[in-house]
Amino acid sequence: MQNLYSEDDTRVKFIDAKLYDSSWNEENIKRNYYFTDGRKLLGGKRAQRKFADYLLRYEGNNLAIIEAKKFSKDPLDGLSQGIEYAKILNVPFVYSSNGEKIYEYDIRNHSGKYIDKFPSPKELFDRIYGNVKEWQYKLLTQNVMYIPQKELRYYQKIAIDKVIEAIINNKNRILLTLATGTGKTTIAFNLCYRLLEARWNKENKDQKPKILFLCDRVSLRDQALGEFNPIESDCKAISAEEIKKNDGKIITNANIFFGIYQSLAANSKEQENIQEEQESKFYLQYPKDFFDLIIIDECHRGGANEEGSWRAVLEYFSYATQLGLTATPKKEENIDTYEYFGESVYDYSLKSGIEDGFLTPYKVKLIKTTLSDGYTYNPDDLIQGELEKGFYKQSEFERNIFLPNYNDFIAKKILELINPMDKTIIFCVNQAHANEVKRAIDKYKSVKRDDYCVRVTSDEGKIGLDYLKLFQDNDKSYPVILTSSKMLTTGVDAKNVRNIVLLANIGSMVEFKQIIGRGTRVYEGKDFFTILDFVGATKLFYDPKWDGEKIEELKEQDEKEKITKEHIKQTKEESKEKKSVTIHLKGTKLKVLDITTTYVGAQGKPLSTKEFLEFLIGKLGEYYDDEAKLREIWSDQKNRERFLKALANDGVDENALKDLREIFSKRL
């Protein structure tokens, strides 16, 4: 009789009944809780989504998951998967049940036991959080705002919960590290909403808190304001315009204030313009204990060292709890950020985002040309200016050595490698180089429109920002290609970017991740994006914990990265001293020597073509022992489709599956 009960029968007849007996109601039970979207595959397909059979919740808090097995199975059969999912979802308890027996596993102390009945929601909540004060309970049980079609992703909820836990534990400096494109502003909005609704503040008064949201650019501040639109009545921008409206007095009649920190520390190199310098000084007019919480967006950019842009702001408002948001993991060049805030309370990596299907996977085309390493003096070339015989490194290009022919050659190659209407961002050495590349693109473009390729740099001002808005609008086809230098490394929310082109040496892991983040956002019909690397930057900046394991030739990355940063710094200093030289290539031949395509595997690991084939062969070996077994699988249509689906879930894309079909059809 027991064998007649399927897993669904077991859930309905036995597990649900036991939950009801322990005071669990439908509001607290989520069945078949899917928490990932499944890695994006070619052809608009996705790998299998991860889900828990049951998620148990109470007062907005995820407390436990249940893995259900059919009545005739051993309840422990589902435990390992349950533990894996519970760790991902940050829930402390796992239950595995066949309807008759219940096994409870406590992840916090790595121990388990059989129990007679499920604990009630309140019992489980108290076991996790213990005795909490009234204000702490309010914070823990305050839900986020319900917005239809915008339910929080699992990692966004965890990030918010981790910050709430840190606040409850009186931690004054908090850091969140989440990859670009994962919705840090969404997290900030929902966190602020919970704090406002729970009426949390540093003095435990019955009033809403005062929160300052800091950005380093006016455009990013305005973008954040847009995200907070559902509670716009609580929000105000600290700006010259708003203060002018307020008869020259600082704005105090709000709960969430948005501003920029760009030049408070008088770091003139980081000032975008005089307006931003003036706006940032308005902070000094607020009392030091005015704010309860300060959120610093992209905190790796301002710098936590004593001369950093936001350091002075935070020291002035040291009374406030301070939350830093960053997209970059701990590395040498942003160590000050981590020393200031401490270790991140929660990390969500690019690798995880791609595996879960919330970020778009990518492939890299490393293009090696005759000038990839540098230029060797050739008397047959037309040289304008003084140039000694010798070898000049590629990092000197467009600083004091100008090669118009080479820019033409690169532009032509870019247009050959991309689809003409695929949105593309080209990162150049500087603003002048961005202008030169635009000129070269215009020379060879097949689409004859003035706005097909545009330059977006700080020199372009409002015109450039208007072009950027059009580029980010998914309903607009033009502009298609943007050329820029540093301006577009952050703050570009363009979901349909298909190509990132690297024409400039990159000096740090932080900058590299910011640039790559321009392409990772998910968009309908976008199965992957492509990095076209003309300078070898992708060889230097793979990060095993963040992006996946290193391939063999990248193992000297740390030393190379250090050398690269030092070399770029040295090159910039030398360029200031040297006179510029323009070289019209007459004798030097321009050609592509090699294009190496690197795939990114299901686990985020970068794979060369050879390694990708080895990966396929290895995957095949997991499903059959010999050729006879493969013939047996392939001869049955249902088995064949199951086999191909299993391969797809392991990250084998449709093109590879098509090749496999052809190979098998000929061979079998």
List the model feature ranges, each with a label.
Residues 335-422, 438:
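Interdomain helical connector at the RecA1-RecA2 junction of SF1/SF2 helicase-like NTPases
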Residues 281-324:
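SF2 helicase catalytic motif II
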Residues 224, 268-271, 299-310, 492-495:
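Conserved ATPase-coupling elements of RecA-like P-loop NTPase cores
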Residues 1-210, 215, 219, 223-234, ...:
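ATP-dependent helicase/translocase motor core
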Residues 146-149, 162-163, 395-402, 406, ...:
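Long, largely alpha-helical accessory region at the distal end of helicase-like NTP-driven motors
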Residues 255, 393-483:
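Conserved C-terminal RecA-like helicase domain
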Residues 26-31, 232-246, 445-462:
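Conserved RecA-like helicase motor-core motifs
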Residues 71-72, 262-265, 300-301, 453-555:
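Conserved RecA-like P-loop NTPase helicase motor core
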